[in-house]
Amino acid sequence: MEITVEHLGSVQFEIRAGNHSIISDQPTSDGGFDEGMTPPELLLASLGSCAGYYAAQYLRKNKLATEGTRVRVTCEKVKDPLARMTNFVIEVDAPVELSDEHRKGVEEAVEHCLVHNTLLHPPKIALKVAGAVAAKNMK
């Protein structure tokens, strides 16, 4: 998997993956134009959309309605001593009443989400900083 991120000016960045792109920005109170989600919001969006995918797959497999399924993801921001996000909560609201069996099934399905599991088992992250020549080759 690979994405590229390019600075557009001010505090905006274009994020590209394959044929798709989105803009990351900051609120006007932080010098942005508020034209896109912030990086922390994108992390929540990634977790929520992954959870939604797995929830909908479970519902579809069990011949239950999927359209209108909603996922809400919340977290807390802390500084201890580094600023980070913690205490994530994923809430899945199916468009139909669920039996206890199906409620548990949705929960188990969401627990297979790649993003969910990555956050539960943090990966190693390597950081490499390069100069102008390497940056030109990224395009």
Predicted regions and their residues:
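Extended beta-strand/beta-hairpin segments
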Residues: 1-45, 55-139
